[in-house]
A protein has these predicted regions:
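Peripheral (often C-terminal) accessory segments that flank ATP-dependent C-N-forming ligase machineries
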Residues: 321-381
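N-terminal-proximal low-complexity accessory segments that begin disordered
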Residues: 2-35, 40-42
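Conserved N-proximal alpha/beta basic substrate-recognition cap immediately N-terminal to
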Residues: 23-33, 45-149
Length: 381
């Protein structure tokens, strides 16, 4: 099931938490994305997408799961089905009748959704890379740090050129950029509130990004840690998600493998296999350091859940090799605006398929009509 508000539920830590209505609408609108990562026999919690969308992706080789209501899902769980959410929370498990699992969602699991985890992982990664000539492109100048004292935070912010992040929230939310003098005082006031409420903030240097990527990993019950692939995406300076990228890799295959192996070794050292089972997405970035040398920062954010990268790794198989494409999620004025937009884009950028029925050019959509949120993309000509 698609529940990207899981981080809010984890922060709230109450079994009665309910996300804002607009985000509930967003979750319903985007539930169709789960079909891209479903397997035979799976059911997706949510309304079935429109027939046109289902047929389009079925012809591209996507498995079409059965879409079920929440009540039907609860019945299936009682009969032995396993609930696999986008991300876990006490509230989610409780609402689906899994009270024991909700009670087992301890403070330790809650810590896995804190940005402090990213600081710990990056520190371990840097220790692994330090002094090793073959890994010097991953040996970064400054690391992110957890700051719990107001005076230390203020000194860091007044130095400028930094990013201040709240401990809770992700995907570019809860972030203050400090690039100019006018940013300093508002950031300090904001960070004081976060330290008072959450106990700390994360401070990290600001780098002009050349590109961003997510290393996708899964930890299994038997203790295996598996590298699933590397995804590329576009975000703004604060790290807010913009677009998923297809055919626009910024790392070499060798670098992708190196980054994955470093992360797996770091997770093993931190003993995550005894504490967590499931998907992990570790965001990273490529930038030029002060000397103009290309650097790869392996860990800027850790997502202990599914990510859009998991979906994109599946979506990319539906495209002709070597094409360059992007897709994104957009909010429209209403459902009619989303439907009208699709009709106009279909006319302006007609779909072209290759001899294997894969997308070669044109406009495509990934989510259902009938909502004021839509996921859509285009293959660059």
């Amino acid at each position: 099931m698609y529940n990207p508000t899981c981080e809010m539920a984890v922060q709230n830590n109450s079994v009665s938490y309910q996300p804002p209505l607009r985000l509930q609408e967003f979750e319903r609108a985007m539930s169709s994305l789960m079909m891209f990562i479903s397997q035979e026999g799976d059911c997706v919690v949510g309304e079935a997408p429109d027939d046109e969308l289902l047929l389009f992706w079925k012809e591209r080789g996507v498995y079409l799961p059965q879409f079920v209501s929440k009540n039907d899902a609860i019945s299936l769980i009682k009969d032995g089905a396993i609930l696999i959410p986008w991300g876990g929370s006490r509230q989610l498990y409780y609402s689906y009748g899994l009270k024991q699992k909700s009670e087992q969602y301890t403070d330790l699991m809650r810590c896995f959704f804190s940005r402090e985890l990213s600081v710990v992982l990056e520190d371990t990664v840097c220790r692994l890379c330090q002094g090793r000539n073959n890994l010097k492109q991953y040996d970064i100048e400054e690391k992110s740090e957890l700051v719990t004292e107001r005076d230390i935070m203020e000194r860091r912010v007044r130095k400028g050129s930094c990013v201040v992040k709240s401990l809770w929230s992700s995907s570019g939310r809860g972030v203050q950029l400090v690039r100019e003098q006018c940013h300093i005082e508002p950031a300090i006031v904001w960070a004081r509130g976060k330290i008072r409420h959450d106990g700390g903030v994360v401070c990290e240097p600001f780098y002009k990004r050349l590109g961003e990527f997510t290393t996708l990993i899964e930890i299994y019950e038997d203790g295996r840690i598996e590298y699933l692939g590397t995804n590329y995406f576009e975000a703004d300076e604060a790290g807010r998600f913009g677009k998923e990228l297809i055919g626009q890799n910024i790392l070499t295959r060798e670098e992708e493998q190196e980054v994955a192996q470093i992360l797996i070794e770091a997770m093993s050292r931190l003993n995550w296999v005894e504490k967590y089972i499931g998907k992990i997405g570790v965001d990273g970035m490529v930038y030029n350091d002060k000397q103009g040398e290309r650097k790869v920062r392996i860990c800027t954010e850790v997502n202990m859940r599914h990510t859009m990268g998991n979906i994109n790794l599946s979506v990319v198989r539906c495209f002709s090799p070597k094409v360059k494409a992007t897709w994104q999620i957009e909010q429209f004025d209403n459902a009619m605006s989303w439907a009208r937009f699709c009709k106009e884009m279909d006319s302006r950028f007609p779909l072209v398929l290759d001899d294997k029925n894969r997308i070669e050019c044109g406009f495509f959509r990934l989510s259902s009509l009938g909502y004021n949120y839509g996921a859509w993309g285009i293959v660059q000509g």
